[in-house]
Regions:
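Short, Lys/Arg-enriched segments at the junction into DNA-binding effector domains
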Residues: 4, 115-174, 178
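Charged docking surfaces used in two-component/phosphorelay signaling
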Residues: 13-24
Length: 230
């Protein structure tokens, strides 16, 4: 089955170029030119990837991303201006999985999309390999990709789940940010290690009673992160 991608940008020439290139690779591409249209399409369809510009009419990309995260963990890649680090951080804070800076090379876009799709597909366990992982108060159902804390479900994005699953599967093992970037985002992922910090912070906000004094995901200062259990 062809992968389905939603491309959102108010610059029609950019959308046209991305659409043509992705369709050449056998993907099915839908297009939206403003935030409200994008949110409507994301609500009514499932996409394997959403390419989402930040500067959009009617509703900006941050708000669109935030709304999508209320009901879906579809992978979202934000299109940001070159050198605008704040936009990159905000995009990740609002739930984006990755970002690509403009102007970009279409080959980079295609490579990034394929890398994330491979990672997302690889994180979906087969039924015969499904399992439930328990660590203290946490229970991860790896088949349905659902997290429960004290039997109460906590909604995670795809990357948040992948990150937590890796740490819980390796209790008390410290991973550097570079290792986590490689293992969770893929070895070909060319992103910034700050991506890891933002996802850890978001994860703590969801699973920790007091994120500033974490019970589960700990920091080994100067080294990296680990899931603590006695």
């Amino acid at each position: 089955m062809a992968k389905k991608v939603l491309v959102v940008d108010d610059e029609k020439l950019i959308v046209k170029g991305i659409r043509f290139s992705l369709e050449q690779d056998g993907m099915e591409v839908d297009c939206a030119y403003d935030g409200e249209e994008a949110l409507k399409m994301a609500t009514e369809n499932h996409y394997d990837m959403i390419l989402l510009d930040i500067m959009l009419p009617k509703m900006d990309g941050f708000e669109v991303c935030q709304h999508i995260r209320e009901f879906s963990d579809m992978p979202i890649v934000m299109l940001t201006a070159k050198g605008d680090d704040m936009d990159k951080i905000l995009g990740l804070e609002y739930g984006a999985d990755d970002y690509i800076t403009k102007p970009f090379n279409i080959l980079e876009v295609k490579a990034r999309i394929k890398a994330i799709m491979r990672r997302t597909a690889g994180s979906q366990p087969k039924k015969e390999d499904s399992k439930v992982i328990e660590a203290g108060d946490l229970r991860l159902d790896c088949e349905s990709r659902r997290l429960f804390i004290l039997n109460k479900e906590v909604n995670l994005t795809a990357k948040e789940f992948d990150l937590l699953e890796l740490l819980v599967n390796n209790l008390n093992k410290v991973y550097s940010r570079e290792n986590l970037l490689n293992l969770v985002w893929g070895y070909e992922y060319p992103g910034d290690v700050r991506t890891v910090d933002v996802h850890v912070r978001r994860l703590r906000e969801k699973i920790e009673k007091n994120p500033s004094e974490p019970k589960y995901v700990h920091t080994k200062w100067g080294v990296g992160y680990y899931y603590y259990q006695n």
